[in-house]
Swiss-Prot record:
Gene: rnhB
Protein name: Ribonuclease HII
Highest classification ranks of the organism: Bacteria, Pseudomonadati, Spirochaetota, Spirochaetia, Spirochaetales
Record has Nuclease as a keyword: yes
Organism: Borreliella burgdorferi (strain ZS7)
Chief subcellular location: cytoplasm
Keyword match Hydrolase: yes
Amino acid sequence: MICGIDEVGRGCIFGPILSAAVVFKKKPSFIKELDDSKKLKKEKREYLSSLILKNSYYAFAEISNITIEKINIHNASLLAMQTAYENLKLNCSLVLVDGKFVPKITAKNVKAIIKGDSIIDEIKAASIIAKVKRDKLMDEYDKIYPLYLLKKNKGYPTKEHKNAIKKYGVLSLHRKNFKLI
């Protein structure tokens, strides 16, 4: 069994970092449609996410902005990937994570793959379901904090988001150790 893991929200200034772990039940028919979530249009991501969720074992992990502030974004990213794998509750023969660094995962064989979200199908799938889940979370936060345009910026430090912080202040879900805040 091969597990792919990726995280989203690393470059954000609002909300959690979110990670997903994916193991395909069998080789999916839509495998050629998979790509790095950042390269796909929203509609395609959501369509593929629904297919991935139906055809795989998966788990998520969220690391809060408070924890990010305590342990830094790098360690929070690794913790998110580790926790997503632990939440999967499967013993995989190979775990492939996107990036340069290997989280503390208790599998026999764990490898970090630079640009893995563009190369490895399981990581592509993890990238897609993680992004769709985090984007939906930002859409929900936008209903609570509409002045920050979270539905549009998804927590990233856009000009409009930074202007909203200047005008309305920092929220409890903002990552206060980022230089922009």
